[in-house]
């Protein structure tokens, strides 16, 4: 009887967990659909010539809940503006906004989040945070220059990092028309992040 009661108590928790995973899957699916739509739109895509003509959609890693992480967030006090190097040799103005610390497979990691001093002048980007990172899938399953993640300023002391929504910079597909921020040394992760957009090394870069 006690075993039966325990199972009944656990079932709602299991059902809730499954519902949350299903919601996460749908969110990632929408991210993938939106990204593909952007690259298939001639007015928005970074692709040119045959690369655009032949593009059918991005390859993606399978969704994995382990790569949606609730990290501890600490805002940087009195950050100073700095010039972040880009792929073209030019620089863009940023400031460090905070740090996210988390564990993955039992090991601790940290990533720095940045704020674009140009984008925050636009109302729709006032809460936007930029997370560039590299990991051990680069140059194998993902772009050698790393990947990006778009975030918003958290209201508390945690921030959700969903690597399932990470993507390659435009420069991975067209190095001639774009200058993309280079991932800072501090954001190079010594681990494989097998989530988000994969990369087919068929583009001019």
Regions found by a protein language model. Name each.
Residues 80-145:
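Mid-length scaffold segments of soluble, non-membrane domains
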Residues 1-22:
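Bacterial Sec-dependent N-terminal signal peptides
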Residues 130-168:
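Acidic, glycine-rich flexible loop segments
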Residues 73, 113-117, 135-137, 163-167, ...:
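A mature extracytoplasmic/lumenal domain signature
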Residues 50-55, 60, 77-96, 113, ...:
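Extracellular/lumen-exposed scaffold segments
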Residues 19-79:
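Start-of-domain marker
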Residues 22-25, 167-205:
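Extended, aromatic/histidine-rich regions of cofactor-dependent oxidoreductases associated
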Residues 118-126, 151-159, 201:
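Short, surface-exposed linear segments at secondary-structure transitions and domain or protein termini
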């Amino acid at each position: 009887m006690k075993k039966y009661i325990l199972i009944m108590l656990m079932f709602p928790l299991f059902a809730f967990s499954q519902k949350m995973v299903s919601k996460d899957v749908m969110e990632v699916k929408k991210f993938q659909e939106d990204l593909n739509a952007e690259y298939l739109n001639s007015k928005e895509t970074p692709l040119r010539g045959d690369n655009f003509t032949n593009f059918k959609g991005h390859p993606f890693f399978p969704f994995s809940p382990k790569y949606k992480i609730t990290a501890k967030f600490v805002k940087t006090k009195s950050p100073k503006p700095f010039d972040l190097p880009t792929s073209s040799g030019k620089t863009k103005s940023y400031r460090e906004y905070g740090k996210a610390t988390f564990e993955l497979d039992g090991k601790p990691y940290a990533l720095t989040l940045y704020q674009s001093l140009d984008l925050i002048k636009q109302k729709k980007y006032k809460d936007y945070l930029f997370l560039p990172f590299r990991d051990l899938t680069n140059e194998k399953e993902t772009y050698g220059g790393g990947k990006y993640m778009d975030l918003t300023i958290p209201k508390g002391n945690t921030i959700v990092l969903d690597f399932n929504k990470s993507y390659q910079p435009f420069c991975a597909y067209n190095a001639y028309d774009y200058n993309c921020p280079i991932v800072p040394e501090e954001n190079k992760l010594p681990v494989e992040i097998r989530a988000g957009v994969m990369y087919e090394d068929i583009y001019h870069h």
